[in-house]
A protein has these predicted regions:
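N-terminal accessory beta-strand-rich subdomains and adjacent acidic, glycine-rich linkers
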Residues: 1-168
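An acidic-aromatic substrate-binding cleft motif
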Residues: 133-218
Length: 219
């Protein structure tokens, strides 16, 4: 595989600037099979789809269920993206990113007719996709290739391209189970609000005197 990034060295007339767009493209010669998920600024919790690249736009509108937390990007897919070149010598290709620091996360816009993808950066409310002070670098754009899908998991590329931890002691980190309320919230079944009161003062309002709305996920 390979990884590449863009560097912005400090220069006399290049100290601060705003990223408007990144035009990195991943072009493929054939209509490969793709395992993909719709791109969303706010959520990564959708079902994976299995289609050819050319079929992504036709499937896109049917590839998600509406929920209460949704900022979709039309005809774009999430990163990482898995592809397969069929034929006598099959090839699996994974597109991802690493070391996303002080820079927007990346999605992939689909050009289905030409079998290619272009980076689509997550914007803020003003439409800016990065406030950069030089010297600076972008995240790594990565392509991992293998004739066997399971061998992609053995690649250490993403591990090596991310910065090592700055924590000196990680012995306290242990595997555990977590039970949260997110799934109930994104389908509109539950909410954070404890009551229907519309004027709550944190540290002042006596919640014991409020009437529960019955929709809080902990109820």
């Amino acid at each position: 595989g390979l990884g590449f990034r863009y560097e912005f060295p400090q220069q006399k007339n290049l100290n601060y600037f705003i990223i408007k767009e990144e035009d990195t493209e991943f072009d493929f010669p054939t209509d490969m099979k793709a395992w993909w998920m719709v791109a969303d600024y706010d959520s990564q919790e959708y079902r994976y789809q299995e289609t050819n690249i050319s079929e992504i736009p036709a499937r896109w509108d049917k590839a998600f269920d509406s929920n209460a937390s949704q900022k979709l990007i039309k005809n774009a897919v999430q990163s990482p993206l898995m592809l397969k070149k069929n034929g006598k010598e099959p090839l699996y290709i994974n597109i991802a990113e690493a070391a996303v620091l002080n820079y927007a996360a990346s999605h992939l816009e689909v050009d289905a007719q030409n079998f290619k993808f272009k980076t689509h950066l997550t914007a803020d409310r003003q439409g800016a996709k990065g406030y950069i002070q030089t010297p600076s670098v972008t995240p790594w754009r990565t392509i991992i290739v293998s004739p066997k899908a399971e061998d992609l998991m053995d690649s250490k590329m993403l591990f090596n391209l991310n910065e090592p931890t700055k924590y000196t002691d990680t012995s306290y980190i242990k595997p555990t189970k977590y039970m949260g309320v997110w799934w109930e919230m994104i389908i509109g079944k539950a909410q954070w609000a404890y009551s229907t009161a519309d004027n709550v003062h944190l540290g002042i309002t006596d919640f014991s005197k409020l009437t529960p709305n019955g929709k809080h996920a902990a109820n």
